[in-house]
Structure formats: structure tokens, C-alpha cells
Amino acid sequence: MNVPQIVKDANKKSDYIVFWLSVIICITIIIATVSLGFIAALYAAHEIDENGFSQFESFFTQNIIFLLTGIAGFMLLLVSIRIMRQTYLGNALQVEYSDCVWLRNWSNKVAKDLEMPEVEIMVTQDPVMNAFAFGFMKPYTIVLNSGLIRYATDDELKAIIVHEMAHIKYGHTKMGTYSSIFRFMPGLGSVFSWILDFWGRRSEFTADRLALAYLKSKEQVKRALVCVHIGPDMAKSFNDLAQQWQVYKTDSSFNRFSQTFSSHPFLVLRLQRIDNSNLINDTLPKISESNDKNNTKTEDVKYGSDS
């Protein structure tokens, strides 16, 4: 079966180019750092430190520690991700055992439409309105904070679920996990994080595009983003005029540079990208609704309810 057209339309090959370019830059920095240290150690090979080691011997000792620390951190991360899932299984609530069982039905439908593995959805006690996906192998997991369940509307939750599932569909969670070995490198971790976040911000735009292409409703996706970022109460005040003014204020070289220190794009820029998107048009093929015939779902999980 061919990959659904909307998945191709929402994705950008340049995302993968930026990711691998970021990885290559990180590797280049490591090689350059080690090479410079090696050269310096050669010039100072005759000098003895307070422990009785030559600078050359100290150099190799430090770099072995550097390498082992990075590898140990990466392996610890892989294990901690699996532990995290088990922790959520023990302490969080799976939506199929709650009043939010419709979220599981919705995610299963999205997974079938997008031809991807079904995901686990868990709710954890946290008043902050947030959601995230994690996992580098099946089963993948989406965690919703209880604050999101309490304040977000059903349509906003649908958009959030599709956004998080996009990260899994496009391999963002897997790529982020594997590239995190650079974030654990002592001394250079913060620099590598800054470099990798260029790809991370692009992945957020891509997930927004897939949510838009799937739901075919700009307002639904925008409301979900605004709700998560500033809350449902203030979201009512975030009208088009306020959005335009904030875009104007953030459209400067300094503000664009400031954004490079954020793991996510500015909210106003995400909303602007959605407004300017041409993904919703008459030529875009719709997902077949024939899959619904064999599903026992409530009216709440019908595809494209806002469109």
C-alpha cells in the first residue's frame, strides 16, 4: 500500500538534510577538538603534570573519559526511555481505562489512515498544558498532561494527537533519541544541542503541517497551538490583530537569532506558517473514510469534524 499522499505533501526532504548536516557538524567539531588537543599534546609531550603523566598521556586519558562518558550517557538514555514507559504504565492513566477512551479510538484511526503503528496514550498528573511523544521502537507513547485534558476542547485534543503522531510517523522521536548522544558530550553538549535544535524546530513545523493536512482546518490546528502555549483563557484575547503585531515585533535579525536558543519555533511564526500554507486545497486527495465502516467509534472521533 502506498504511503498516503498527505504524508508526502506535509513532509520535506530538507528536514532530513538539515538533520544529517547537524550531525555531520557535531562530528566535525568533535574531530577538530580532538585533533587540536592531539597537536597541543604533541608540542607539550615533554611536560609533566602534577600526577607524573606527560601532557600526551593526559590528553589520551581525558579523551577516553570524554568518549566513555558520552557513550554511557547515550546508553543510559536508551534504557531510561524504556524505564520511562514502564514508569508511566505504573503511575499514569492509559486513556482506554478512562472517560477519554475516545482519544484511543481517534489515535487508532489516525494510525490506520497514516499507515503507522498504533500508539499508547497516557495521562499524567501535571497542571501544565503540554503533550509529548517518545520512543525509538514500538510501542511508541504519547503523554498528555492532565491540564491539557481538563482545559482543551475535543477538537484541540484531536489536533494535538495528530501533531504528536506526526513526530512518530516521520521518525522525529527516533532521530532525536539517537542524536542525543551529542547532547551528553561533556563540555560540548550545550553547543551540540544548539546545533541540533535547528532540525528540532523544523520538525515542529512539519508536525504542524501534517496535522493541518489531515484535519483540513487551519483554525483547529491554530487553536490547539494557542491553547497549549498561552492557555484557554488568554487564547480568547490572542486575535488576528495581536498575532500580526507579535509577528511584526519578532521579525528582526536579533529576534530570529534569539529563536535559535529555543527548542521550538515561536508561536506566532507557527501560526503564520499555518495561515500561509497551501496544503488545504481542492486538489489534495482526502483520506478514504471507508476505514470507518468496520470501526465502532463515537461521533466524537469522526475525521475532519471541523472542516
Name what the model sees in each region.
Residues 113, 128-153:
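Active-site scaffold of zinc-dependent metalloenzymes
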